[in-house]
UniProtKB/Swiss-Prot annotation:
The gene is ENODL17. Keywords: Cell membrane, Disulfide bond, Glycoprotein, GPI-anchor, Lipoprotein, Membrane, Signal. Glycans are attached at residues 79, 94. It comes from Oryza sativa subsp. japonica. Pfam families: Cu_bind_like. One of its GO terms (molecular function) is electron transfer activity. Residues 1-21 form the signal peptide. May act as a carbohydrate transporter. Required for male fertility and seed yield. Its main location: membrane. This is Early nodulin-like protein 17.
């Protein structure tokens, strides 16, 4: 009898694990994760002191891009440096953090809001070698053409039907196994 109790306990555990796994499978099909994009600051020119007539070089570069959490920016440079700074450090070219100066550094944009970067060389920063970007929380889903009402209902039913089928298959397999094992006792 003790062995049967152990077996029933194991099967209950198996059913719980199966239900959780089925739920994860369903949520994975419904909630896709976002993979961020990677941008090279300054494009092909990279991170360098802008020419005197282009002190807004990096502001113009960033204006054409919408940054989101999970994106990353790479600074590629020669004989220079880059440091992440706060708002004060950006506007006053005052870098107090350790600077990267190995030719390339990648920063993950992991929080919404403004992010500030500058050359650790205050003179370069004052000449425009600094970057301020606004990072958005998440991209909004792109609008897609609305299907005809019948097509929309069919597509929605097919998506929820396939997710439900996977969860039910796991549950039925667990119940069948339990029935086979208990039938032997």
């Amino acid at each position: 009898m003790a062995r049967r109790d152990q077996l029933v306990s194991f099967l209950c555990f198996f059913l719980i694990v199966s239900a959780v796994a089925g739920g994860l499978c369903v949520s994975a099909t419904v909630l896709p994760m976002r993979v961020g994009k990677q941008y090279v600051v300054g494009g092909r020119s990279g991170w360098r002191t802008p020419p005197p007539a282009s002190v807004d070089l990096y502001a113009k570069w960033a204006a054409g891009i919408r940054f989101y959490v999970a994106d990353s920016i790479e600074f590629v440079y020669k004989n220079d440096s880059v440091v992440k700074v706060d708002k004060f450090g950006y506007y006053h070219c005052n870098a107090t953090a350790a600077a990267a100066n190995d030719g390339s550094v990648l920063f993950l944009l992991d929080a919404p809001g403004f992010a500030y970067f500058s050359s650790a060389d205050a003179d370069h920063c004052k000449k425009g070698q600094r970057l301020m970007i606004n990072v958005d929380s998440a991209p909004s889903p792109s609008p897609s053409p609305s299907p005809a009402p019948q097509e929309a209902a069919t597509a929605s039913a097919a998506t929820s039907s396939s997710a439900a089928t996977a969860a039910h298959a796991l549950l039925l397999a667990a119940m069948a196994m339990m029935g086979l094992i208990l039938g032997e006792w």
